[in-house]
Amino acid sequence: AINNTVDRVHQSMEAFIHNMNTIHSRGGNQVVFSSINYGTDTSAEGRMVIEELLKATIEGLGTRGEVPVFPIQIFKIKDGVSYSEADYKRAMEDFDAAMEGKVEFEAPNFDLFLKACRTTAKALFPNFMFLDTPFNQHEKWDASDPKRYRYELATMGCRTRVFENLNGEKTSLGRGNLSFTTMNL
């Protein structure tokens, strides 16, 4: 049953990437400029989605494996969740074994971090965001909170940091861009 589920999730991630790169719905002739942030979900289901999205990204689009531009992918790095210095040292001791899943790590998603690095090397995405950087931290973030994503920074597109809020709680939920503006000076 689990193999069937993995196959279905993989096919869903392939479809997601395909649709984000082919559905023309912006002004009738552009694909949706889309972004997805991930890397901190440690549930079995969340890990499966992340892993299959990374695999589908490496496979690329079509029979030639064209690198997908969308969605812009951002892998969130959080100490103790998707990274630890001890795990880094352990992975560097036997990198091939680490990449093959033969090394035990402390951080539950460190293996996904390694796979994200491999994916970036082959397909340019995901980008990486460090949640422990002082200006990206949220005082309410707690590793034991199943809804900790409410207190995680997110980015949209190539560069828009969605987090701070002048008129309410600091969160990335329910926030986004309505329009872009270009100024030629």
Report the location of each language-model feature.
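Conserved catalytic cores of very large enzyme subunits
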Residues: 1-185
